[in-house]
Every structure is written in structure tokens, then in C-alpha cells.
């Protein structure tokens, strides 16, 4: 069947490809069953120090490049893409137009020397990142090291929860709590609390005090609007803690060993831990998925997948499907058997059972997924296939690959995102 007959959509997709040092952007236009690929002009490398390189913010409605100067904090819009612009890790606030850009600091100390000296690293907040009206709102110094972000907000079951941003700090073993309600001017985009994740009894050295830095190594941070709690995974201790956003206190602690990250289902009912077993079998990496029920406080679902290392996770618009991309990990012998090009699709309506309904082999690892949604339903899913420089287009209902589009030269990293869409 002709792809245009199967799903008569007109869409424009942006495709970033890079090698962690330099990159470029292609634009994929699909209309009337035909696809055209164009490339943004490239600006030579800036040759600036790493912390001074321009930060890539997004693209405008007119396909111009939005950049943030990390020194002057000015937003610049231009037609060309600086080859060494930094594609920072971004977390989007689900209830506003604000995006949060993570700065993990330098590798040696975890400090953002430009903004925070030797006192930590930072997050920067920009509004309207897909518009020529993009606005820089501020840079906030937090703890040191790699960050993750979660955003709390009021819901029907937790109406008193405030709008707050939680930022985990890997090297410090802390969480920075930041006001995220512009109506509360005194706290807005300011650190209002720091949560020390130390568990003294699990520290190999120390005097039993609540030390920071510590070995909590937080990596896995989510908010459930159903329970009204924040869930943080302490990788160093093998525990998951529950935080009350009304007072930022740790109110529960659960053993949760063998996991390296968390994600939460769109309805907030289940927190899913993902991890990998590289020790029990010298020839195989075994992916691990554990389903924690926020209402019962139990873990009723556990799944293992041989020769899989989970990379990124995504949900469809309905919240009925989970998509997991895969990557490389393990010893050379284990990597011989690893399915690094797999895209796994699960039926979330079967939870707490992790029901796998489709496995695609894309030919290489997916760099990212993007979703075309209509009236609250996912019509198409796009996978940026980094090493091949292609995009796989997947039907959101049948889960079948509709077509694969050649976009650019392959590279180690890629990211695709939707710029516009409508039905023809």
C-alpha cells in the first residue's frame, strides 16, 4: 500500500545528527506521499572553550536556528547552524512552554565553572523554544554532576501539590528543589531546598552523619500525579525514596537494587525501574524491568529480556503503549549477542505485566523517537536511526514500519523532533 494512502499526513521533521563534538541539522518534508530532505547551512566551528560554545535551543517556525550564548545569556536567531553548537539534554515542563537545559559541569569536578565557580553545576530555563519569541529566563546553580529533572503539579488526587522542579545531582548525592510557579515571585526559578539523599548506614566510610557529597548517585527521578509523590532512585544504595512535595521530606524508602533509571506511566499508577544484569551470564546482557505500584507500594511485575540493553523510553499519546530503544553495553563477548538495533513496543493496558507486542530490528540503534499525534492519539512514530542516517516511520496503530527515509550521513548520535503536521 502506498504510504500516502495509508496515512495521508503532511509533516515536517527536524533531524539532528552529530558525534558529540560537531553536528548538523536536516529537515524532512513529507506531503502528497512524497518526501524531500534539505539541510541547514553550516557555520564553522567557534573554537571556543567548551563552556562557552553556543547552546542549541531549537528551531523557529521559519526553520531558523535558536541559540543561547552561555556567556552573555543572549538568545540569537540565525539561518545557519554552528557546527559545534552544544545540544544540551533538555527536560520539558509538561504544564508550560518552559524547557530546562541541563549543564552537568566538567568531567573532573562536576562544576559549571562559568556560572557557579566551584559551587556546583547549573540548569538554564528558556521559554518558547520552537519560536522566534524564545526567551531566556535564567540560569540556576544546583549540585554537582549529571542531572535529571522532574516537575510536580496539582492533580485531582493531589490538588495541594505545588508547581516545583526537582533536579538530581549525581556527584553530590542531593536533589535541588526549585520554585516553578511564576505566580510565586519570591520562589520562582530559585532553589528553595536541597534534599540530602545520604543513607549513613550504607556509606563505607564516614562518621554516620548525613554527609554530602555521598554515594547515593541519584539517577532516576519521576513524579506521579496519582500519588502526589516524587520517586528518586539512589543507584549507589540500591534504594528508591519517596519525597513529599509539600515539604520536600523523604517519607518512604524501598529496596530497589539492580536498576539504573526510572520512568512513570502517563497515568501515574506505575513507576517502572529499568536495569541490566551483566554478571550472571558471561555471554549475555539481561535487561530488567520492575513495575512498582504507587498505590500498594508493592512491585507486582518483573520482566527480564535477554540480549537487550535498554536505552530510552517513550509513550504514545493515549498512554497505552511503551516504546523502548536499545543500545550497547557489556563485555565484547556479551555485545556479540546484543540486539542493539531493537525497538520494543509494550502494551501498557496489561500492566503490571510487561506485555511485549512488537519487536523491530532497525539495523542500528535508534537515537530518539518522535510522535505525530492527532486528537490525543498517535498516528505515526518516527525513529532517528543514528548510524544509518535514516528515519523509520511506524504506524501508531498497527505498529508496522510504513517506510524508511534516507536523510543524511550516519553518525554516532541523532535526535528527531516534529516541527509541524496536519492531515491533507
Show the residue positions of the predicted features:
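Predominantly soluble domains enriched in secretory-pathway, periplasmic, or organellar proteins
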Residues: 1-424
Amino acid at each position: 500500500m502506498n504510504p500516502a494512502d495509508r496515512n495521508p499526513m503532511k509533516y515536517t521533521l527536524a533531524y539532528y545528527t552529530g558525534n558529540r563534538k560537531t553536528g548538523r541539522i536536516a529537515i524532512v518534508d513529507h506531503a502528497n506521499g512524497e518526501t524531500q530532505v534539505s539541510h541547514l547551512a553550516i557555520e564553522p566551528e567557534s573554537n571556543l572553550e567548551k563552556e562557552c560554545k553556543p547552546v542549541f535551543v531549537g528551531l523557529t517556525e521559519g526553520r531558523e536556528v535558536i541559540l543561547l550564548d552561555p556567556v552573555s545569556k543572549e538568545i540569537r536567531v540565525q539561518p545557519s547552524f554552528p557546527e559545534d553548537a552544544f545540544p544540551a539534554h533538555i527536560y520539558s515542563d509538561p504544564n508550560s512552554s518552559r524547557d530546562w537545559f541541563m549543564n552537568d559541569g566538567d568531567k573532573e569536578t562536576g562544576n559549571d565553572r562559568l556560572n557557579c565557580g566551584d559551587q556546583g553545576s547549573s540548569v538554564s530555563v528558556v521559554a518558547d523554544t520552537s519560536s522566534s519569541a524564545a526567551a531566556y529566563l535564567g540560569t540556576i546553580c544546583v549540585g554537582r554532576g549529571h542531572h535529571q529533572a522532574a516537575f510536580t503539579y496539582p492533580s485531582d488526587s493531589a490538588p495541594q501539590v505545588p508547581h516545583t522542579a526537582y533536579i538530581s545531582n549525581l556527584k553530590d548525592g542531593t536533589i535541588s528543589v526549585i520554585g516553578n510557579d511564576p505566580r510565586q515571585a519570591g520562589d520562582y526559578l530559585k532553589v528553595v531546598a536541597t534534599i540530602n539523599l545520604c543513607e549513613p548506614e550504607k556509606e563505607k566510610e564516614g562518621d554516620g552523619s548525613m554527609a554530602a557529597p555521598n554515594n547515593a548517585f541519584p539517577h532516576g527521578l519521576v513524579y506521579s500525579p496519582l500519588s502526589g509523590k516524587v520517586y528518586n532512585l539512589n543507584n549507589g544504595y540500591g534504594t528508591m525514596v519517596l519525597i513529599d512535595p509539600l515539604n520536600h521530606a523523604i517519607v518512604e524508602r524501598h529496596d530497589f537494587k539492580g536498576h539504573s533509571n526510572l520512568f512513570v506511566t502517563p497515568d501515574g499508577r506505575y513507576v517502572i525501574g529499568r536495569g541490566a544484569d551483566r554478571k550472571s551470564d558471561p555471554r549475555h546482557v539481561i535487561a530488567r524491568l520492575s513495575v512498582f505500584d504507587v498505590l500498594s507500594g508493592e512491585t507486582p511485575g518483573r520482566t527480564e529480556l535477554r540480549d537487550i540493553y535498554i536505552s530510552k523510553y517513550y509513550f504514545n499519546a493515549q498512554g497505552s503503549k511503551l516504546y523502548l530503544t536499545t543500545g550497547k553495553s557489556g563485555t565484547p563477548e556479551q555485545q556479540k549477542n546484543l540486539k542493539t538495533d531493537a525497538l520494543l513496543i509494550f502494551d501498557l493496558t496489561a500492566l503490571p505485566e510487561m506485555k511485549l507486542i512488537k519487536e523491530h530490528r532497525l539495523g542500528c540503534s535508534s537515537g530518539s523517537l518522535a510522535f505525530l499525534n492527532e486528537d490525543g492519539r498517535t498516528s505515526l512514530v518516527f525513529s532517528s536511526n543514528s548510524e544509518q542516517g535514516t528515519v523509520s516511520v511506524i504506524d501508531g496503530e498497527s505498529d508496522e514500519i510504513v517506510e524508511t527515509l534516507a536523510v543524511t550521513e550516519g553518525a554516532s548520535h541523532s535526535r528527531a523532533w516534529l516541527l509541524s503536521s496536519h492531515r491533507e
